[in-house]
Design a protein with these regions (language model features):
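A structural motif
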Residues: 207-227
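Binuclear metal-dependent hydrolase catalytic cores centered on His/Asp/Glu-rich metal-binding motifs
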Residues: 222-242
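Catalytic alpha-helical scaffold of carbohydrate-active enzymes acting on polysaccharides/glycoconjugates
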Residues: 2-214, 240-267, 273-333
Length: 346
């Protein structure tokens, strides 16, 4: 068992913004920033067709399926539902309502479906890089993970004509944040689930230098993946109720007459899961509910990142700082202070 060197500074930030989060100052005085992510992974999952040792086991209609060292045709077809039918059902719904999406696109998957990639681009949805493969990187060697990142970005750039500006691995490794910083050029990294607001993370790169990286947190709770987990959603009403409760709490927290602490809410979607007819109704109900409220900013993740950089720019560390990015000295003022990042580890 490998133990962390206790003589080194503790590398986790358990405090964050603490009791005084910064005022997000969302556009048009919105009380909440709401962001929908569509994960596109079908065709890049574990498969012997892709050179993997066994078939996929994660996020499908099957409960705890065994890995097969051969093609698993049932598992393949469950994934194919997402790329053949589910994705179009979700896309049509957002197009009908003229609402934006961020697509977490796995490059191998998008490469296999050029019509869909073109549709994402034509509809103005952001395509963030979700890696080259949709596999677990926890135990993959660093050189291979770095190469997968390079290939993923290269393919996505070739497919869309634009370099991806957002990153999300999902099943990441201890070195993922560092490798993202090594490549540079990303406006945000979303491999984090521990806050309701974006924040600046100081990442030590492989060459020893430190770079500020904006983190736009993602979610595993307001996420349709819980339809495929043991403690998750059994039916669409469970999903709708959980999303509604999450929205209501955050919308209330953003009330200028109350706490006046606007937050962000991410909704995670998967084509093969939420794209099923029996679950789609819950999404429609939630969208109806959200659109009955006036002070909601529905946006893409890149929009949140750019807003945050303008409203809460990164400040270099101060000698007496703690290393944690917190609001400036007057969080109660009407102006939005920049974030003060101390000199400690992040």
């Amino acid at each position: 068992m490998k133990h962390y060197d206790s003589t080194l500074p503790y590398p986790r930030d358990l405090v964050g913004y603490g009791a005084s989060p910064p005022h997000a100052a969302w556009p048009a005085q919105a009380r909440i920033a709401l962001q929908f992510v569509l994960n596109y992974e079908e065709g890049a999952e574990n498969s012997v067709l892709h050179g993997d040792a066994a078939s996929e086991q994660f996020l499908s209609e099957m409960a705890s399926p065994a890995p097969f060292a051969a093609r698993h045709l049932s598992m393949e077809s469950l994934y194919e539902y997402g790329s053949r039918a589910g994705v179009w059902r979700i896309l049509r719904e957002f197009e009908r309502r003229q609402l934006p999406l961020t697509v977490f696109g796995v490059s191998m998957a998008l490469q296999r479906h050029p019509e869909l990639c073109a549709a994402f681009k034509e509809l103005g949805h952001e395509i963030a890089c979700h890696g080259w493969r949709w596999i677990s990187y926890q135990n993959l060697d660093e050189a291979s993970e770095r190469e997968h990142m390079r290939i993923g970005m290269q393919i996505l750039t070739e497919l869309t004509g634009e370099r991806p500006l957002g990153w999300y691995t999902g099943r990441d490794s201890p070195q993922t944040h560092r490798l993202v910083a090594d490549f540079g050029g990303f406006e945000y990294d979303s491999d984090y689930y521990g806050d309701d607001l974006p924040f600046w993370m100081r990442v030590q790169k492989s060459d020893g230098s430190v770079a500020p990286q904006l983190i736009v947190p993602y979610t595993l709770d307001t996420n349709d993946m819980r339809f495929a987990s043991s403690q998750g959603f059994a039916q669409g009403d469970d999903f709708f109720s959980y999303l509604k409760d999450s929205f209501d709490v955050l919308y209330a927290e953003g009330d200028p007459a109350g706490l006046n602490t606007p937050k962000m809410l991410s909704i995670g979607m998967h084509c093969r899961l939420l794209g099923r007819p029996g679950r789609m109704k819950s999404l429609q109900k939630f969208l109806d509910y959200v659109q009955s409220h006036s002070q909601v900013w529905i946006c893409r993740r890149i929009d949140i990142a750019r807003h945050w950089k303008q409203a809460h720019p990164y400040l270099p560390p101060t000698p007496a700082g703690s290393g944690i990015c917190r609001p400036g000295p007057d969080p109660g003022s009407s102006a939005t202070p920049p974030l003060d990042c101390g000199s400690g580890p992040q």
